[in-house]
């Protein structure tokens, strides 16, 4: 592997993890403010250091954020909804590349995650014990209490509305 980039966005807010370690932890409330029906920011993260051993789990924690029902007057079309779109692009020394996307593979959903409720005006109800359990699952790749989601069962995030986040160059 010579280069690996994770391109990610969400309707709502998200944290993303590779192999149990958070990617982009210096940014909070990713992807930032945006009306998911008209405009949504995406972020780009270099992730080579997360993929050293060749085996990894990708995980998202998603909350409603700006799209919570209490603050959704300007975002009525996406109120109280969440969704992700991501592309992990790995480039190899021989010139080949591997793309892993949110729309093609099956995803595992853990319906009882650590964020019990969230919103831009509400704040967040967070259960630390559930986070520790989730982090252990992510590090070991063992997803016992899970639901399989196909990529197309996630709320669609349109490519036509994507724009680079103001911190991306």
Residue ranges and their predicted role:
Residues 161, 168-169:
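Single conserved hydrophobic/aromatic residue that forms the stacking wall/gate
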Residues 1-134:
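Accessory beta-strand-rich segments of carbohydrate-active enzymes
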Residues 12, 166-168:
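A very general structural signal that marks isolated residues within well-ordered alpha-helical segments
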């Amino acid at each position: 592997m010579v280069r690996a980039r994770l391109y990610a966005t969400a309707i709502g807010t998200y944290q993303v993890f590779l192999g149990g370690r958070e990617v982009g932890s210096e940014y909070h409330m990713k992807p930032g403010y945006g009306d998911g029906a008209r405009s949504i920011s995406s972020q780009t993260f270099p992730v080579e250091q997360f993929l050293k051993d060749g085996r990894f789990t990708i995980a998202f924690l998603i909350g409603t954020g700006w799209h919570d029902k209490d603050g959704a007057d300007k975002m009525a079309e996406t109120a109280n909804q969440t969704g992700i779109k991501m592309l992990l692009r790995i480039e190899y020394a021989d010139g080949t590349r591997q793309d892993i996307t949110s729309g093609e593979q099956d995803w595992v959903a853990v319906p009882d995650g650590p964020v019990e409720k969230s919103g831009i005006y509400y704040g967040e109800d967070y259960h630390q014990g559930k986070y520790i359990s989730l982090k252990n699952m992510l590090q070991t790749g063992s997803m016992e209490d899970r639901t399989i989601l196909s990529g197309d069962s996630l709320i669609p995030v349109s490519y036509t509305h994507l724009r680079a986040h103001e911190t991306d160059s």
